[in-house]
Amino acid sequence: DLKVMSDAITALKENGLRVYTQNIIGNPGETFAMAMETFNFNVKHGVDFAECFLLTPFYGTEIYENCVKNDFLEKGINMDNMPQSYWLGSCIKFSSLKEKDKFINFHKFFSFGVQHPYLLPLIKIIMKLSPNKLFVLFNRFYDSWRITRVIRVKMDIVTLLGVVKMNVKYIFGFFLKTDSHSKF
């Protein structure tokens, strides 16, 4: 219920607490206008970090069963080759490749846009481009930096190096792929 969430965020902000939301876009049948409602909700409430994910219906979940039952998955996608990352692309069918690319790119700039809504016109231009690895790199670095501003966690050097290693491996592993529409 949006009113309950709205009231909760307002109460948290009024009491000086940071608000971190996790948003999922690219749901079956979702329009870009619906994704913008999610974006605008975050902007309106001044959330401190609006993390965003592309829907990945993992095997064994109700959403996976719903996607299989209603033919919402792209051709050839099944439990054996489901993308393991909700940061790169989507295995959900969209009305067109252009619409899918728009969602994929919007995802990459969602959290940045919530913090800088005055740049939405520029983000909308960027969304018209083909998804690319530079956008992935921007998203991972911006979100990684932004979350450290919201969730203040003290880490020992071993933990910090482990987190850095994981992100570097993830980012450069993706960069070795040649297909800009890669789902994996």
Language-model features and meaning:
Residues 105-184:
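Membrane-proximal basic amphipathic "stem/tether" segments
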